[in-house]
Every structure is written in structure tokens, then in C-alpha cells.
Amino acid sequence: MPLPTAYRANGGVWRPSCARAAAMTGRPILTAEKMRAAEQRAIDGGATVEELMEQAGAALAEAAYRFAGPTPSLVLCGPGNNGGDGYVAARHLAARGIPVRIAALAEPKSEAAKWARGEWSGEVETLSESTEASPLVIDCLFGTGLKHGLEQAVSEQLARLCNRAIVKVAGDVPSGVESDSGVELSEVPHFDLTVAFGALKPAHLLHSAMHKCGRVVLADIGIEAESDWREIEAPQLPPLDPGGHKYDRGLVHALAGKMPGAIALAAKAAALGGAGYVRVSTSRPIEGLPSAVVQTDTAEVNDERIGCLLVGPGMGDIPQVLTLALTSKAPKVIDADAITHLGEPERLKGQDAIITPHGGEFRRLFGEIEGDKPERAVEAARGSGAVVVYKGADTLVASPDGRLGFRPPAPAWLASAGTGDVLAGVIAAMRSRGLPAFEAACAGVWLQGEAARIAGPEMIADNLADAIPDALAEACSRQQ
């Protein structure tokens, strides 16, 4: 059989003809340090701190008004610039004729916050046990850069006022949250809305803070937010060649092991995820596979047409399967038991691999890497040369070149047996279709989350796989 044109044209290295690099275009995510640098660039360009504060506070007021309408409001202001944003927000809400009160934790300390306090013409209460509740509470006590929990008395008053409010809004990040790690440094109430100033922060998409933010909206405050860390958005899928054939759409070759159910889920997901041809090497027939998935008793891992090799789901204690996979020059998705049998990350170098560990598998393979989850993910990818899909409630996708994708909040019902097998299959399909490794992993992560939303809370992994075509349709509709 003659090799496809795309193979011959790429110097004997198989890449489907639809292959093209896809830029990461999701919303940028800035750490506290990078946010300060972005603000400083704006200031160096002629903006003032007061102008940035005015834009942040005005945006906070606008978002709160759109969310809650003309609701009597209580703005809680801290001593720093986050408190200054609160003074500005209160002024803009009052200008709409909304009854507004301010309760301050302390007098402003920064010059910009003092300016914002001076622009407020109303009274300022002291935040205390006697502070009366309000239907709308806006939290501007502390923002990014917080490194310690709130004092107990402050935490108690924040909780009391939020518990009695109808609507709770946070400015930038909820007070008590460490913005870079998503860790709750002290008790954090559940907010209905969080208004991120200038850029998303890691905490907006990291466990456990993400679950306290409610809906997160992004406010433009006039800064240029550039980052290699971005929110994963709907994938830009490569167009199909009208004159192409199944190999142009990508061949996924999966290696079965002891537990056929897992590889069956992964292979089904790869087929439903758009791969043109899915093949499973198995020593015995696997029941329940779609008829379109080819079962073979030979492991043709060096077939030059393979767009992606999938190994790990259901592999069990058969390390020889992984050893065989690592002899192939094809791009790989390495999941589940295969991750455990890697033993050391050095085996990934030169493999063009995507690995998909959950927390336990990550620690067993990479050890105790220092830093927050994003830093650990990036370091693991750099050290191994593989794209790392660090799974969890806050799944991250890390590239060896330092790029990091944060999955948007996904349904909690994804925490179910077999959903990781489906994810591995979808990523393999995306890789076989020609997306580069990082983009393929991000695409698979987004599609899995969207499929879970479509499948609903009663889903099992089989339903998740069945929903992949609808998730693909949603991604395509967003491209138009």
C-alpha cells in the first residue's frame, strides 16, 4: 500500500495533512508578581495608579449592578489598594442612586487608596460586630498577594455579613484566598460573583478557591496582560481535507492489557473524538467496542501511518506493553498503569509524549516537586520533555516550553470511574488529527469537560464518551 502524500512530504515522519500549529488564545492568567509587573508597565507608559484604581472600581460597580440590580450595598474596604477599589466602586454605585455604605477595616495606607477614600463623600463605618448586614456585600478587604489568613475577628465578621446577604461579590479575589495557589488561608465564604481586575488569577481556576468564587468575570482596567499561562478555551480544530481519507484524519493505535473495559472506553472515545481510524492490539476479543474500531492480535507499533499511540488504560501489571510502546517513533498518550510503570521521568525524553497523571501518579513519577500545583506541573513538563496533563478538580496542561493551560471549571460529576480513560482517548484523537501535543491535550481536556456538561449529573463514563460528538459540534460552532 503506498504511503499517504502527507507522509512522503514530511520526510518520512507521519503527520496528517491537516496538521498545523494552533496558538493558545485563551484568557491570560497572571500571578501576583506578574500582575504587579503588568501594572508597572502601564504606569511606565503614562497611566497613574489612581487611574488604574478608578477603572477597577468602576468595573466592579458595573459588574455588581448588572448582576444584582439596584440593591442596597455594603462595601468592605481594607487598608490597601483592594480597599481603594472598593471606595471607587461605592462612589459609582452611589452615583446610580443606590444606597451604599462602607465599612473599613482600617485607614487606607497607600497613596492611591487614600485618594480613593478622599473621593468618597459619604460616611465610613468601622468594620465590627455592630456593622449591620446588607442585601449586597462587596468584599474589597484584601486582594492578590495575601500570604496569611485573616485575623479571626475579621474572618468572623466577613462570614457573618456574607451569610446574611442575598448577593455576595468579591473584588479581584475573595479575601482569605492566596491568589497564586488557590489555597484558602482562612475561612472563605461562598461568593456569587468575583470580578477579576485586568487578568484572571490562578486562584480563579484552582482548587479550592475556585469553588468559592462563583461566577468569574474579567474587567478591563487598561493593562496589557501577557502570559504563557492561559485559560483553556474551545479548541480550534484543523479543517478536514475534502479529498482526504481515513489516515488523513488520523490513526490511533491502542494497546490493550489486563482490563479490556478501560481500553474499550478509550478506543471508543478516540473514534467518537474524530480519529479517522482506531485500532486496538489485543490478545483476546474485546466485547462492546464499536464495529468501526478494528481489533488485531498484532502490535504494529512501528506502522508509519500511526498518528498517535495510546497505552495505559487497563494495562495492569504488564510493563512489557509500555516497553513495546516506547520503541515506537509515533506520538504517544501515556495514561494510567503505564505512568506507574514508567518508573522515572527520564524515560519520556525524546518520546513526543503526552502523559495524563492524577495526583498520586504524578507524585510517584516526579516525586515531591516544590511549589504550587502550576509550578509543579511546569517543572515536571520541563524536566521530562513531555506534555503533562495534571488531572484533578483543577486539571492543568503543562508544556516543556513553559506554557500552561488551566481547564475552565468542569462539572463535579466528572469524578467517576473511567472518565480518565475517555480523556486519554479524546486526546489521542486530537493528536492523531495533527494538533501539536500541547494543543491536542488542551483540546481533549476542554472536550471532556464540555461532554460532561452535556451528559449530565447521572452520567457514567460510557455516557461521557457518547457525548463527545456533541462537544465537538459545540467547539466547531464557536469557530464560526
Label each residue range with its predicted role:
Residues 136, 141-229:
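Internal gly/pro-rich beta-alpha loop/helix module
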Residues 152-168, 319-336:
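A short, gly/pro- and small-residue-rich
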Residues 123-132, 338-348:
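Short amphipathic alpha-helices and their capping/turn segments at secondary-structure boundaries
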Residues 18-105, 193, 199-333, 340-354, ...:
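Small-residue (G/A/S/T)-rich helix-start motifs and N-terminal tracts that mark the onset
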Residues 61-141, 149-171:
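Nucleotide and nucleotide-moiety/phosphate-recognizing core
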